[in-house]
């Protein structure tokens, strides 16, 4: 479907059952045309609004990561079940390269190509575009399970989530009161500068979960992207922009306790910084990630 053709969202669908994170930051839309196992059969759309913005009034990198993750799961999951929506796709790993800035206002679009489907895994790659411009390239691996099995696990976990204790932030962390519109829309986060990076903490909320009742992969990457740009800015004193991001999902999280992430900046120069981090919840490692950040001089205040 050409990006320059007006999009009739009435011909598109949203996930059923509802996905709290996608509904909160989206909605995200998709349409399947023809054989879901073929390249280009799945077309995804994210209408962009002010809440998706970063400091430069472009679409936040975390929003693009979340949309790429959505597209990966759609392309890989529907290839695994032939378009029947009987599979639940969970991201194992994903890599995204940012090629251009997305503007707030026009919709983002994504499509992809299933590469291989095995008994447990599905591999796919694709792109995110806007008005004919390629904004990002993505590739990744999903694990696919029966949707009925994933929903049963959600039902088992619901009582524990409803009895979760109030969450608190340790002393020494400062609220990021001037965070970007997208980051604030997701929820408050707190930071502490380290000698070689930063540590960030974010209390979790129900809208950060996916339809399976665990923390959404797009949410975790959104938090990680905010963390790497914050750490790069604190260490270098320059304005950061993510140009590449890769993540490996190690375990599932839930909305009962805060997430924390320690970001290191092993090396940086005048124009690039290289970062890595680990996202944890109550000592459990959930996400390992790395990023390349473009640096530029900050505009005079």
Predicted regions located by residue number:
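Terminal targeting signals and extreme-terminal segments of soluble enzymes
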Residues: 1-301
């Amino acid at each position: 479907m050409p990006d320059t053709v007006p999009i009739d969202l009435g011909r598109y669908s949203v996930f059923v059952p509802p996905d709290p994170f996608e509904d909160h930051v989206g909605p995200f839309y998709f349409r399947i045309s023809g054989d879901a196992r073929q390249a280009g059969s799945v077309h995804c759309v994210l209408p962009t609004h002010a809440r998706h913005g970063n400091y430069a009034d472009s679409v936040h990198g975390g929003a693009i990561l979340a949309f790429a993750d959505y597209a990966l799961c759609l392309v890989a999951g529907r290839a695994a079940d032939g378009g029947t929506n009987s599979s639940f796709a969970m991201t194992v790993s994903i890599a995204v390269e940012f090629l251009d800035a997305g503007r707030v206002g026009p919709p983002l679009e994504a499509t992809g190509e299933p590469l291989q489907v095995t008994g447990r895994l599905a591999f796919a790659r694709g792109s995110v575009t806007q008005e004919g411009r390629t904004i990002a390239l993505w590739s990744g691996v999903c694990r696919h399970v029966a949707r009925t099995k994933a929903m049963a696990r959600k039902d088992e976990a619901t009582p524990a989530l409803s009895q979760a204790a109030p969450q608190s932030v340790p002393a020494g962390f400062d609220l990021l009161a001037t965070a970007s519109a997208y980051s604030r829309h997701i929820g408050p986060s707190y930071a502490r500068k380290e000698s070689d990076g930063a540590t960030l903490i974010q209390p979790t909320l129900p809208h950060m979960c996916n339809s399976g009742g665990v923390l959404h992969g797009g949410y975790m990457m959104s938090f990680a992207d905010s963390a790497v740009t914050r750490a790069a800015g604190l260490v270098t004193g320059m304005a950061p922009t993510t140009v590449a991001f890769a993540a490996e999902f190690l375990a599932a999280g839930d909305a009962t306790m805060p997430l924390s992430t320690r970001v290191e900046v092993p090396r940086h120069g005048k124009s690039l910084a290289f970062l890595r981090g680990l996202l944890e919840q109550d000592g459990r490692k959930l996400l390992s990630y790395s990023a390349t950040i473009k640096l530029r001089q900050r505009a005079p205040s």
